[in-house]
């Protein structure tokens, strides 16, 4: 029987080389918003960290993140909520560095949003059951924040596109809010006339607008709604969850005009005061967005750029309508070349569908 081999390295053998360290992105610079002005290489990756504060109504300086006390009307016809009762969407535009000095090239570089890490900030603040909330038991703590809650965020290269849907089309919304125009009973289900862009912070009530699923090709949005009277908020805290923003073709939102748009709405539920009144409670949302540079075909022909430049330099006048359905333009004449003097100046000349010059007598 042959002797068994000894385990381990042979005496005098050269020691094994340690494994090479794993390759990770090299950090060039870190700082505030001024870092976005630094020019980087084609393969550079940029990470932007930001947060959006909630827009719940803020009835006074001491109640930031709360709405005004809610009140319900007895009839649909008399519904007229106060401005500060209405939680609204939060939104912001983040300017990114300009990547293209020459816009006449066939290919351009654009920022592409690849991933996002996000979470609601301040979850544990709702553990405070001793600050003016209604008592559950005579000698116990207060009632926790509970009830219908909505959590939503969006990241894109364009403002979020919205579809308006109303609970009650007869509701009279206050000034300072942007709501669907000319609502009808059809507005309580689906009315394709109610379209809008989320282009203003603290102006679009959450109860009136939802993201438009038929649009938003250049935006990624995520949201959950849980309804009920005594539903507890269920939220998570982690820095390990990453949401991929790429579509089925592997392309993320492309930031047009070097602009990144973020939106959010985090309504955690209702806070019940000791008097029995209730207020919406909202929290802020944190974002960490990773962007890379992507080569794309130039969508802007030079003629379009020159025309846009000239139009921007033209003085704008808010005057009477000269185009559209109510145009006040009566007649347009086009002259080309010369001809012998006609004996009838009232002849109507036009070019037909086949491109032939036709003459019609009045």
Curated annotation (Swiss-Prot):
InterPro entries: Capsid_VP1_Polyomavir, dsDNA_vir_gr_I_capsid, Polyomavir_VP1_sf. One of its GO terms (biological process) is caveolin-mediated endocytosis of virus by host cell. Homomultimer; disulfide-linked. The virus capsid is composed of 72 icosahedral units, each one composed of five disulfide-linked copies of VP1. Interacts with minor capsid proteins VP2 and VP3. Forms an icosahedral capsid with a T=7 symmetry and a 50 nm diameter. The capsid is composed of 72 pentamers linked to each other by disulfide bonds and associated with VP2 or VP3 proteins. Interacts with gangliosides GT1b and GD1b containing terminal alpha(2-8)-linked sialic acids on the cell surface to provide virion attachment to target cell. This attachment induces virion internalization predominantly through caveolin-mediated endocytosis and traffics to the endoplasmic reticulum. It is found in: Virion; Host nucleus. GO terms for cellular component: host cell nucleus; T=7 icosahedral viral capsid. Keywords: Capsid protein, Caveolin-mediated endocytosis of virus by host, Disulfide bond, Host nucleus, Host-virus interaction, Late protein, Phosphoprotein, T=7 icosahedral capsid protein, Viral attachment to host cell, Viral penetration into host cytoplasm, Virion, Virus endocytosis by host, Virus entry into host cell. A motif (Bipartite nuclear localization signal) lies at residues 5-19. Residues 1-21 are annotated as: Disordered. This is Major capsid protein VP1. A DNA-binding domain overlapping a bipartite nuclear localization signal is present in the N-terminal region of the protein and is required for efficient virus formation. Belongs to the polyomaviruses coat protein VP1 family. One of its GO terms (molecular function) is structural molecule activity. The keyword Kinase does not apply. The keyword Thylakoid does not apply. The modification Phosphothreonine is found at residue 338.
């Amino acid at each position: 029987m042959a002797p068994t081999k000894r385990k381990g390295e042979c005496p005098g053998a050269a020691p094994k080389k340690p494994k090479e360290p794993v390759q990770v992105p090299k950090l060039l610079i870190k700082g505030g918003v001024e870092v976005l002005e630094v020019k980087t290489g084609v393969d550079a990756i940029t990470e932007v960290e930001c947060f959006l504060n909630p827009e719940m109504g803020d009835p006074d300086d001491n109640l930031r993140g709360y709405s005004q006390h809610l009140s319900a009307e007895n009839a649909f016809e008399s519904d007229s909520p106060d401005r500060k009762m209405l939680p609204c969407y939060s939104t912001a535009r983040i300017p990114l560095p300009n990547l293209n000095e020459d816009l006449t090239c066939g290919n351009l570089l654009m920022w592409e949003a690849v991933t996002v890490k996000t979470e609601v900030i301040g979850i544990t603040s709702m553990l405070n059951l001793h600050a003016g909330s209604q008592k559950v038991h005579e000698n116990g703590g207060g009632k926790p924040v509970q009830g219908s809650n909505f959590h939503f965020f969006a990241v894109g290269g364009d403002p979020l596109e919205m579809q308006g849907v109303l609970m009650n089309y007869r509701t009279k919304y206050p000034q300072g809010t942007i709501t669907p125009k000319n609502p009808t009973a059809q507005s309580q289900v689906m009315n394709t006339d109610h379209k809008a862009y989320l282009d203003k912070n603290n102006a679009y009530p959450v109860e009136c607008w939802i993201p438009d699923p038929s649009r938003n090709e250049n935006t990624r949005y995520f949201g959950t709604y849980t309804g009920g009277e005594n539903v507890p908020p269920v939220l998570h805290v982690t820095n390990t969850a990453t949401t991929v923003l790429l579509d089925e073709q592997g392309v993320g939102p492309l930031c047009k005009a070097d602009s990144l748009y973020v939106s959010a709405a985090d309504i955690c539920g209702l806070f019940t005061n000791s008097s029995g009144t209730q207020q919406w409670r909202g929290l802020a949302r944190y974002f960490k967005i990773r962007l890379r540079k992507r080569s794309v075909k130039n969508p802007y022909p030079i003629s379009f750029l020159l025309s846009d430049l000239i139009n921007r330099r033209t003085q704008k006048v808010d005057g009477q309508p000269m185009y559209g359905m109510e145009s006040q333009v009566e007649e347009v004449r086009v002259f080309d070349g010369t001809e012998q003097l006609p004996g009838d100046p009232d002849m109507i000349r036009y070019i037909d569908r086949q491109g032939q010059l036709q003459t019609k007598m009045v």
